[in-house]
Amino acid sequence: MDSSVTTGRSGIGTGQGSPAASGQPISKAGQAIPNLRDRIPKLEPRRRKQEPSNPTPVPETPALPPRPDPSTLVFQTPVRRILLLKDHELFLASPSFNLILSFVFSLSESVADTPISAIKDSDLSEPVKAILRILDETEALCKESPPDDQGGSRFGNKTFRLFLDKVKQRGHQWHAAFLGGKLPDAAVTEASAYLNQSFGNRTRIDYGSGHELNFIMWLLCLYQLSVLEQSDFKAVVLRVFARYLEVMRLIQMTYYLEPAGSHGVWGLDDYQFLPFLFGASQLLHHHFITPRAIHQELTLEEFGHDFLYLGQVAFVNSTKTVKGLRWHSPMLDDISSAKNWEKIEGGMRRMFVSEVLKKLPVMQHFLFGSLIPAAEGMSEQDPNALGSEENEEEGGEVEVYDDSDGKRHVHQPTGWGDCCGIKVPSSLAAAEEMRKRGQVESLRRIPFD
């Protein structure tokens, strides 16, 4: 038999001269399969430059400047100096801006990873104890001045003005008691002006982040006067500021203070800002309390007394007539999706600069004296043209003027400021009135826009 074997119809043999005999691969067409591996370009993923989630850098903490020598200062009653847009721009580029930033951020850094319970009574200095006594007496004045019966009205209660008058009358006495005559009366007058503006506006019967800032500026004045030291910073936040929050919550609920400059549901909080900055620092590296924990009622109940952030969220929840952060505080709800507290703390630093110090409607009420000086070139307030800050009508944005009806406005003459709008009662007042009538709702229907 012939050594070659045919395949019949294909006619392809396996003899000596065939491709199979030579070891070459066979295709159906009888040709060698080409190696395409080297011809096809290698697939590589595109390397896109990752943009930061927030292009605005986290503000750093400036170094605290040296404190002034009190003997070189000419003490004065603090007054408003941000009357025009250019005044605000001068302030943002001034040493006082850096002074405020360094003081607030230094306070925040001092309480990193520290619960309130870590500060014992034995750790408190005498000035800190004296400040706590002042806050205790302020609370007592509030309880001694019960609100008038307004027939169920949810607007600010006018007895609040009587309460503020009592605080102002006691202010000099309080300072003289704990300063012990170490400072001249003019210094006491300057420092006490900030405390007087820390509990709300007498005319508008409202309260906002600007009043909260005034309380911190009062503490800054005491630091500038060497009454408080850097070693007191931790106690200042965790004991003094925490106590201030307790007193303010009582005042807000007693007199139905309206939120000053509130963003409504789209704001962080109707009244406060700093509990979120200081509170995020407290939780910076916490092992098990994550940002999502603010949705857990048991966590808020168990740890709210120890961490300012959680305590403020718990208070906000208690004052809303609709349950769920998603509905009444969507910004807090959004922030809770952050990966860690470091992200939140950095965001709160940005927000303090952008939403407090860089907001003209907030800073137009800021007071400048010798301890927190105005920048050179800023406008000077005419004492004959404007009343005191506590009697100032609702603030606006740029320019102070009176219209044809004699109403004072603080914004562009062609614009529409907060002073022109209809007063809106606080949600806190709504919740309190519901409780008084025994109407406790677990859920309210929310209308569509």
Curated annotation (Swiss-Prot):
Its EC number is 5.2.1.8. Keywords: Cytoplasm, Isomerase, Rotamase. GO terms for cellular component: cytoplasm; nucleus; protein phosphatase type 2A complex. The keyword Repressor does not apply. Transmembrane segments: none annotated. It catalyses: [protein]-peptidylproline (omega=180) = [protein]-peptidylproline (omega=0). It is an enzyme of class 5 (isomerase). Residues 1-72, 378-416 are annotated as: Disordered. Residues 54-69 have a biased composition (Pro residues). Residues 389-403 have a biased composition (Acidic residues). It is found in: Cytoplasm. GO terms for biological process: mitotic spindle organization. It comes from the Eukaryota. It holds the Pfam family PTPA. The keyword Isomerase applies. Belongs to the PTPA-type PPIase family. PPIases accelerate the folding of proteins. It catalyzes the cis-trans isomerization of proline imidic peptide bonds in oligopeptides. Acts as a regulatory subunit for PP2A-like phosphatases modulating their activity or substrate specificity, probably by inducing a conformational change in the catalytic subunit, a direct target of the PPIase. Can reactivate inactive phosphatase PP2A-phosphatase methylesterase complexes (PP2Ai) in presence of ATP and Mg(2+) by dissociating the inactive form from the complex. This is Serine/threonine-protein phosphatase 2A activator 2.
